[in-house]
Amino acid sequence: MQFSALLRQSVRQDDVVLRLGGEEFLIVLKNTDPAYLTLLAAKILDRVRSFDFDLGEGFTLRKTCSIGLVPFPLFPDKPDLLSFEQGIQVADLALYHAKHHGRDQAVALFAGPNGPAQDEDVQRLVTDLGAALDQGFLRMG
């Protein structure tokens, strides 16, 4: 409850914080400039690092978190290319990249110079981060 409250206090009133399960949360930011994503991620990372989570009986704990973020639509010139669920899959790829490359960081993924042209390209985009980066479908930002 403390972590979700910290997230809700970090976002704007119209934004939505959802628990996906376990320790994963989804924040939906409405009408947001992609540059704001990285600012918000930095703010959340700082707040989590400095927050004393109350364990009861006088004990506290400091935590860190990892963040994966993407704008939606991911491809502004092709807003229907990915479904909302596929956008979440791409954000999940970013999250796992952050977790597997040091934790306590945010990884942002943006549209790359080569938008996917075929359905199998879209499938690769949402399941294989390395291939999506190599083929220019995505870029880290």
Regions found by a protein language model. Name each.
Residues R62-T64, M140-G141:
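A structural micro-motif at secondary-structure boundaries
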Residues F3-R8, Y36-D54, I88-D92:
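Alpha-helical scaffold within the catalytic cores of cyclic-nucleotide enzymes
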Residues G21-G22, G58, G102-R103:
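A short glycine-centered flexible hinge/capping loop motif at secondary-structure junctions
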Residues V16-R19:
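A short pre-motif secondary-structure segment
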Residues V28-L37, G56-T60, S66-G87, P113-G115:
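Catalytic strand-loop-helix junctions within cyclic-nucleotide turnover domains
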Residues T38, F72-R103, V107, A117-F137:
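Catalytic-core segments of nucleotide cyclases and related cyclic-nucleotide turnover enzymes
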